Regions:
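Short, charged surface segments at domain edges that flank catalytic/cofactor-binding sites
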Residues: 1-59, 82-85, 125, 129-147, ...
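Proline-rich intrinsically disordered, low-complexity coils
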Residues: 2-3, 55, 62-68, 77, ...
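Generic ordered-secondary-structure signal
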Residues: 35-38, 54-58, 65-71, 90-93, ...
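Short, well-ordered alpha-helical packing segments
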Residues: 43, 47, 51, 55-58, ...
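Histidine-centered nuclease catalytic patch
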Residues: 58-91, 100-106
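Domain-exit/linker segments immediately C-terminal to small folded modules
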Residues: 87-170
């Protein structure tokens, strides 16, 4: 909601300043300035949001988010209509990314033979938005129920998630 008065504007400005300072400290820890390569800054930000864990395996990632064994992964695959936006990106190992391939997390869980709830449990402690969690769980809702629409078209094809008013990252 937009600020309604000077006090709310001041509070919002202070929150923005604190977030900016926190982000800058995080980048400084990894020797990146604010003009650093966007993909490197994005990896650091995602590592922080994920609390240093892989959302697909639940295992600890290397302490350095710039480790060459890690890469950015599209949660909802690009080949299926996924966008390169923060809400659709996760940091994981190259090997996990290759194994997941062009699958949604739900399809990847089926490939691994693990319950999807187990994959979702990996994300519970992560600092993810509701939108990112929705994208991660895309495909789980097979038919309309209450206020939740099916993730599938009438012909059974998986719909593309609504990425909303999100700015592309790449």
């Amino acid at each position: 909601d937009p600020p309604r008065n000077a006090l709310q504007r001041a509070e919002r400005d202070q929150e923005m300043k604190e977030r900016r300072e926190k982000r800058n400290k995080l980048f400084e820890q990894h020797h990146l300035d604010d003009s650093g390569v966007a993909s490197r800054r994005r990896r650091v930000t995602l590592w922080e949001q994920q609390k240093g864990k892989c959302p697909f395996t639940g295992k600890e990632l290397p302490a350095n988010p710039l480790d060459p064994s890690l890469e950015l992964e599209h949660i909802f695959p690009e080949d299926m209509g996924g966008l390169s936006v923060e809400e659709n990106l996760a940091l994981t190992w190259r090997t996990v990314n290759a194994d997941k391939g062009k699958r949604t997390p739900l399809q990847f869980a089926a490939k691994l033979g693990v319950p999807f709830d187990q994959l979702m449990a990996h994300t519970q402690e992560m600092r993810w938005s509701a939108k990112k969690r929705e994208i991660f769980a895309w495909g789980a809702i097979k038919e309309d129920r209450g206020d939740q629409a099916s993730h599938y078209n009438p012909d059974g094809a998986l719909r593309i998630p609504d990425f909303g008013n999100i700015t592309r990252m790449a």
